[in-house]
Design a protein with these regions (language model features):
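A short core secondary-structure module
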Residues: 159, 163-218
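Buried hydrophobic positions in well-ordered alpha/beta secondary-structure cores of metabolic enzymes
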Residues: 9, 20, 56, 82, ...
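Internal helix-loop-helix
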Residues: 49-119, 123-128, 171-179
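A short, Trp-centered hydrophobic/proline-enriched beta-strand micro-motif
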Residues: 128-137
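Flexible, small-/acidic-enriched active-site or ligand-binding loops
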Residues: 148, 154, 211-229
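Short secondary-structure junction/hinge motifs that connect adjacent elements
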Residues: 26-51
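Cytochrome P450 C-terminal beta-domain/meander region
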Residues: 142-163
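Intrinsic disorder at enzyme termini
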Residues: 1-14
């Protein structure tokens, strides 16, 4: 396999490096001051995002974009050097709409969302109008093994009811966060007459609006050397 960057990827890398040098590095001290003072995201972030989009440095991570969706449609191999360039600053990826957990969430929605879900969630995420979070970790279990998860989902008529507690959910306290993708286990529906699947086939990812009834963000946990929510 040829790992040499394509001409297109090389040109984008040069534009990315120039953008980081010209716009992001000069803002780095102000970014750190702002987040240490609790002013996250700093007010200049939206201006930088608009500049990045004008430069064609937007949604660089998703190769399967449709023609009407904003982005570059790079392969993963082409994206790799751009990710390296963004890695010069811990906050740079957000400027290019390439920050986690939104990248993974957008890929999930791009592959599996219904047309209504695409319109409600994927389109504003691709535009950078909202942020999202992926809720997996839980306080009382070793959550890296999904079979340990205690959060459940059950169906009541046309409604899905999610019950549980999550923590260390990157982005959940971001002021622009509007969507949680919550990893749950199927609740045991005693009245259904259906046998429960085994522990490795009980999981679902549920789209939960942050303003849905019953959703509470109780606190923003502090993490060493990380000030973003």
């Amino acid at each position: 396999m040829d790992f040499a960057p394509s001409a297109r990827a090389q040109a984008l890398r040069e534009r990315m490096d120039a953008f980081v040098e010209r716009y992001l590095l000069p803002h780095n001290p102000a970014w750190h001051r702002a987040v240490q003072e609790g002013a996250y995201p700093p007010p200049f972030m939206e201006d930088l995002k608009a500049l990045a989009r004008e430069e064609g440095l937007w949604n660089l991570f998703l190769p399967g974009l449709r023609d009407d969706e904003p982005g570059t449609r790079l392969s993963h191999l082409e994206y790799a050097p751009l990710a390296e360039s963004m890695g010069r600053l811990p906050w740079a990826a957000e400027v290019f709409n390439c920050s986690a957990p939104d990248t993974g969430n957008m890929e999930l929605l791009h592959r599996f969302a219904s047309p209504a879900q695409r319109q409600q969630w994927l389109e504003p995420l691709l535009q950078g109008h909202i942020r999202s979070a992926f809720a997996m970790s839980e306080p009382d279990v070793a959550s890296s093994d999904p079979t340990n998860l205690q959060t459940t989902v059950r169906r009541e008529g046309d409604t899905l009811v999610v019950q549980g507690r999550k923590w260390f959910i990157t982005g959940a306290a971001h002021p622009h966060c509007r969507l949680l993708i919550v990893l749950c286990r199927s609740a045991d529906d005693e009245g259904s007459g259906e046998p429960m699947p085994d522990s490795h086939h009980q999981h679902s990812m549920v789209l939960v609006p942050l303003d849905a009834p019953g959703v509470q963000v109780l606190r923003n946990s502090s993490v060493p050397h990380q000030h973003t929510p």
